[in-house]
From Swiss-Prot:
The family this protein is said to belong to: Belongs to the QueC family.
UniProt keyword annotations, A-Z: ATP-binding, Ligase, Metal-binding, Nucleotide-binding, Queuosine biosynthesis, Zinc
Function summary: Catalyzes the ATP-dependent conversion of 7-carboxy-7-deazaguanine (CDG) to 7-cyano-7-deazaguanine (preQ(0)).
The protein's enzyme class: ligase
Keyword NADP: no
Gene Ontology BP term (one): queuosine biosynthetic process
Subunit structure: Homodimer.
Pfam families associated with the record: QueC
Catalytic reactions on record: 7-carboxy-7-deazaguanine + NH4(+) + ATP = 7-cyano-7-deazaguanine + ADP + phosphate + H2O + H(+)
Keyword DNA repair among UniProt keywords: no
Protein's UniProt name: 7-cyano-7-deazaguanine synthase
UniProt cofactor note: Binds 1 zinc ion per subunit.
Length: 219
């Protein structure tokens, strides 16, 4: 298994950017892979491109526009408004069915062609917002499936799986990239960089985590 190279599933948001810099500390060569799935806000991809260019990371964008046809949701459809809070039943309408499954599967194919075994993704079960494809059991089962499907040994690493948003901010701080993550990333479901709109679930979670980070670790 090649332990010197890693591929990061990279959206340009808080979590994946933290994982990108975590990977840069641990591996000699890091490649970032982003996806164009016809998301409303192309600024997400612009952020990803800008970060990779600025910090000298090889970057690839894969076309996954078909996902928008298969799974209508508030992140890809202009006529669907993002839920401001989680529903009492079911998943938020910002959940894209199959997104992490497809992202990781496509990245695995890409990784094998590059001779890379390690795939890093920023999913977290602690702050998973009700998304079933952010759970550890899903990642573990998919890892086994990909190994069997391609007769190749993958290692899917999830640095954020068991930490909350405050601890994710702390990780960025420890890596020396707190300002980069705070100012140069896009987490907002309404496509606003840095602090975002402040109203969507992603912005609320990000802000809550930052305030808890300041209270717990910076006092």
């Amino acid at each position: 298994m090649n332990k010197e190279k890693a591929i990061v599933v990279f959206s340009g948001g808080q979590d994946s950017t933290t994982c990108l810099f975590w990977a840069k500390k641990k591996y000699e060569e890091v490649i970032a892979v982003s996806f164009d799935y016809n998301q409303k806000h192309k600024l997400e991809l612009d952020c990803a491109k800008d970060i990779c260019k600025k910090y000298n990371v090889e970057h690839h964008i894969l076309d996954l526009n078909l996902l928008n046809q298969l799974a209508p949701n508030s992140l890809t459809r202009q006529d669907i408004t993002v839920d401001k809070s989680a529903p009492k039943e079911g998943v938020p309408n910002s959940f894209v069915d199959g997104r992490n499954l497809l992202f990781l599967s496509f990245v695995a194919v890409f990784a094998k062609q590059k001779g890379v075994n390690t795939i890093i993704t920023g999913v977290s079960q602690s702050d998973f917002s009700g998304y079933p494809d952010c759970r550890a059991v899903f990642i573990k089962s998919l890892n086994v499936t990909l190994d069997l499907a391609m007769d190749y040994e993958f290692e899917i690493i999830t640095p954020l799986m068991w930490i909350n948003k405050a601890e994710t901010w702390k990780m960025a701080y420890d890596l020396g990239v707190l300002d980069i993550v705070k100012e140069e990333t896009l987490t907002c479901y309404n496509g606003i960089k840095a602090d975002g709109c402040g109203e969507c679930p992603a912005c609320k979670l990000r802000k809550k985590g930052y305030l808890e980070f300041e209270k717990q670790f910076m006092c």
